[in-house]
Amino acid sequence: MSRVAKNPVKLPAGVEVKFAGQQLSVKGAKGTLELNVHSSVEVVEEAGELRFAARNGDQQTRAMAGTTRALVNNMVQGVSQGFERKLQLVGVGYKAQAKGQVLNLALGFSHPVDYELPEGITAETPSQTDILIKGIDKQLVGQVAAEIRDFRPPEPYKGKGVRYADEVVRRKEAKKK
């Protein structure tokens, strides 16, 4: 059995799990998420936790059981607590402003960048140079943060650009005469 799949997923109070064939849905205070479980993975709910096992013992199904366990754990955490990713804008004149489902960015281009947020994702701008991406789907929160960062990734000479709050930008020395 996969080492990851051996650990059960604990269900916190207020989180419901429903099975409909291969469809697994997790419902919590923040919303509902669904996952299609691979046919080779067996999911059992007992005593407030979910256990995962491979139906047969080959390598691929054991790996799939571990992957499914990790995805369901992220779903449970998402519907109960949610996920967030913080971005920082570094550079003269770099600004961000959230207006509903649109994030307006001034990133040193000759035009403003308007990023349409997908459904289920919210963005807050506590200051003009900080962006806070929130949502219940871990993959989608990370994807949105990566797409925003890709507009102007941090450059190694001056460090200007959009970076994750916990990112360390390796700096290079300027060319000497």
UniProtKB/Swiss-Prot annotation:
One of its GO terms (molecular function) is structural constituent of ribosome. One of its GO terms (biological process) is cytoplasmic translation. Transmembrane segments: none annotated. GO terms for cellular component: cytosolic large ribosomal subunit. Keywords: Ribonucleoprotein, Ribosomal protein, RNA-binding, rRNA-binding. PANTHER family: 60S/50S RIBOSOMAL PROTEIN L6/L9, LARGE RIBOSOMAL SUBUNIT PROTEIN UL6M. This protein binds to the 23S rRNA, and is important in its secondary structure. It is located near the subunit interface in the base of the L7/L12 stalk, and near the tRNA binding site of the peptidyltransferase center. Part of the 50S ribosomal subunit. Belongs to the universal ribosomal protein uL6 family. This is Large ribosomal subunit protein uL6. It comes from Pseudomonas fluorescens (strain Pf0-1). The lineage of its organism: Bacteria, Pseudomonadati, Pseudomonadota, Gammaproteobacteria, Pseudomonadales.
